[in-house]
């Protein structure tokens, strides 16, 4: 009989009783699937028997992020560009392993605290010293404020996805878009615990982006890297820039850039048509966050440490 061991609730720090299950233990894809729960906190534990492999799942997905960061999160998730994925995106936002939750908390804090531009500059992602105005931020293709520029960018992104014959219900939604107006645009592909995706060279999606103007990349080398999400974002950021400076950033843990994963990423990068106005950059979480944590509120520093973004 499968035995799921007892755990400690990450919120109230009280025990969650272990469970013996008759038969095969189901995979938990939402709170209601969890056989071990802290009902008062609304936190369930995935049905992994190995304590080290457990993912905690919140009944209310917003419970997975600090109270101070929750304003606007539901609205942004509801506007994510990939319509078909919205429901599962919101549900997975409540997982302790959620990449989207990390993306929201980090970038909204940097924006709301007025540190977004400075953090990008200190991470070496912005070189333009004349750039001073607060940029426009979109997460998952959704504007995070009511400004007209965000809606304009979202509308243009929809047009580009349609022109590439993407499914209207499954448009590409870059993790992060930072628009600097006449100074250019930046896409950020965020990785938390996972590596970059690995698609085979015969994957059906490649032809959609392979011949997109104005790209002059070595597409066969791009395909051999398997970095499909990055390739799609490179195509879209170049098209969205419309002659302005364009930057694609791969943001993640430092291990993303070493070993076999790093070699695969380097294969992708060397196949791109980069120049002074079309850049690819790598950034570790520590590059983005370390400089500003000394003055950060306690809730934000704790979140970054608990999620392993910084040591």
Walk through the language-model features, giving the residues of each:
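Active-site beta-strand-loop-beta-strand hairpin of nuclease catalytic cores
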Residues: 178-187, 195, 238-244
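A short acidic (Asp/Glu
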Residues: 107, 118-119, 198-200, 257-267
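Acidic, metal/cofactor-coordinating or nucleic-acid-engaging core segments within structured domains
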Residues: 197-251
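Nuclease-adjacent, charged terminal/linker segments that flank catalytic cores
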Residues: 1-142
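Non-catalytic C-terminal interaction segments of nucleic acid-processing enzymes
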Residues: 1, 231-311
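Active-site metal-binding core of divalent-cation-utilizing nuclease and nuclease-like domains
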Residues: 20-23, 129-183
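Short, flexible loop/turn elements at secondary-structure junctions
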Residues: 42, 108-110, 178-182, 191-194, ...
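Phosphate/oxyanion-binding active-site loops and adjacent basic polyanion-contact surfaces
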Residues: 98-102, 169, 222-230
């Amino acid at each position: 009989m499968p035995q799921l061991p007892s755990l400690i609730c990450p919120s109230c720090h009280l025990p969650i009783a272990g469970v013996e299950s008759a038969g095969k233990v189901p995979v938990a894809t939402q709170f209601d699937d969890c056989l071990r729960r802290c009902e008062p906190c609304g936190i369930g534990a995935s049905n992994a028997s190995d304590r080290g492999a457990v993912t905690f799942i919140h009944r209310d997905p917003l419970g997975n992020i600090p109270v101070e960061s929750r304003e606007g999160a539901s609205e942004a998730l509801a506007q994510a560009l990939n319509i078909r994925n919205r429901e599962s995106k919101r549900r997975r936002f409540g997982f302790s392993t959620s990449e989207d939750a990390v993306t929201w908390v980090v970038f909204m804090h940097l924006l709301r605290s007025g540190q977004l531009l400075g953090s990008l500059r200190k991470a070496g992602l912005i070189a333009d010293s004349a750039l001073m105005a607060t940029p426009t931020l979109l997460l998952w293709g959704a504007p995070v404020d009511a400004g007209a520029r965000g809606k304009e960018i979202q509308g243009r992104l929809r047009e580009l996805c349609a022109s590439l014959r993407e499914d209207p219900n499954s448009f590409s939604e870059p993790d992060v878009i930072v628009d600097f107006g006449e100074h250019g645009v930046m896409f950020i592909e965020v990785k938390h615990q996972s590596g970059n995706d690995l698609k085979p060279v015969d994957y059906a999606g490649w032809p959609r982006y392979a011949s997109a103007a104005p790209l002059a990349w070595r597409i066969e080398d791009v395909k051999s890297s398997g970095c499909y999400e990055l390739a799609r974002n490179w195509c879209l950021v170049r098209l969205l820039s419309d002659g302005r400076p364009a930057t694609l950033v791969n943001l993640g843990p430092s291990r993303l850039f070493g070993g076999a994963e790093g070699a695969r990423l380097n294969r992708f990068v060397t196949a791109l048509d980069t120049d002074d106005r079309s850049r690819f950059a790598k950034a570790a979480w520590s590059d983005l966050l370390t400089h500003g944590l000394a003055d950060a509120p306690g809730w934000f520093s704790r979140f970054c440490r608990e999620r392993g973004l910084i040591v």
